[in-house]
Amino acid sequence: MGNTESGSHQKGLSRILPEEKAEIEQFFENMCRMQSGPKKSVGLQYFQDALRNSLPCSISQRIFDGIQSVRTNSKSSTMSAEISKEQFLVFYVDLLRGTAEEKSQVICDMISCNNSEHMKGHQVQKFLEDIIAAVIYVLKQQSLLKGWNLENMRDCTLGTQGLAMQLLSQLQSIDGQKFERQELLDSPCSKSCIEDWLYKIPMISLFVRVMLTVGLSILKHHTEHQKDMKTLLPKCTGMKNTSFVSLLDLPAVMHLNYYLPYEVQHKWRLLFSSQIHGESFSQLCGHILDQGPCLLIVKDSDGFVFGGFASQSWKVKPQFQGDSRCFLFSISPRLDVYTYTGYNDHYMYLNRAQQSLPNGLGMGGQHEYFGFWIDSNFGIGHSKAKPSCTTYNSPQLSAKEEFSIHTVEVWAVGDVPEHLLAKNPRSILDSDTEARALLEMAGQTRQSDGLREVTEEDES
């Protein structure tokens, strides 16, 4: 594809500070020094060898292809077998600070190594899988999982494929068309379509930035990187010392967190799991009432996984509650998020022990026809959303309209509500070290600290 010419490179380089430029160039110079003999360029084999412990081989190949496509000399019509420091610098700056057009030029070459102007959906899908897998790899390698235990979660491989397909479907729906899976994989993707996609779906650029900054340890201490890491993956609390396996996989956590309000993206804490607390509607209510915003996830007896985000604390009341930040989602067999349509305000509902109104927990739709519903009998629920839920435009989320519940789990998101800290600081502090620090800063010391055993949670 032979992307940008040297005239635009200087404009691009103006987006970085001199010290940032020096850090990027230093990385490349260090690679060159490690080769035998004085060299100012790097070939594919050595490039992959140098990154072997930092990134998976499949993505280092794509990075090399992207760097190689950068034309720093407008007079040159041939592509060198080795990459230069200037190419590396331009590549890095374009992907981190470039416009959607500049990013798309590089990413198209990373997707299709034969420099085709038109790509197929399956090529984009494989690129996305490689990028997502690389992000998970570097987070694991550098101990940046923030308390998430991959052994206690759904398989990341399936989650990676699901997220890649979800992002691909957004590429294909930019022009308003919707395709089934095989149609998505076989359909053509133009460079202009990729550019629009990158502009409208910032999550792809987020993955690329994290892969480069964390994987290569370049500019990883800058403020924009810290913001990326907060958006990408929340801190997990409440998962230690438990034997349950979460209904979530890491790609699903990343995707759902991306749709949450920014102020609650930094932390998730486990409130309830039917595997731990039992299959009881009373137990569910007891663990989620007045706990702040939370994600409720259900697995039905057919293996479908889905749920909803409640933007406000759950309260038992006969009226609908919540606001337009609420949404429904599916995780398996399809990863997707369904946001507010504006049709009605039936965001969330929780009621019990009433004779004239439905007793249970629901989101979207209307009484007896919820987008998703857990009955107060707990073992059953429904998703009556044909053709779609009026509140969230979601399809039927469960395998059958009326389903049997296999598992339920609930995660609170954001900081612990202040009223809980004031009401029962002891129990909150045992699971939330940040909350403990806040109380200590306020002068509320813990007299019993030396009298109880230190748990694994305390030492993390």
Swiss-Prot record:
Presence of the UniProt keyword Membrane in the record: yes
Record-annotated TLDc domain positions: 246-414
Location in or out of the cell: Membrane; Cytoplasm; Lysosome
Chief site of localization: membrane
Keywords, in A-Z order: Cytoplasm, Lysosome, Membrane
Keyword Cell inner membrane: no
Function of the molecule: Activates an alternative mTOR signaling to regulate cell proliferation and migration.
Protein name: MTOR-associated protein MEAK7
Source species of the chain: Xenopus laevis
Taxonomic path: Eukaryota, Metazoa, Chordata, Craniata, Vertebrata
Gene: meak7
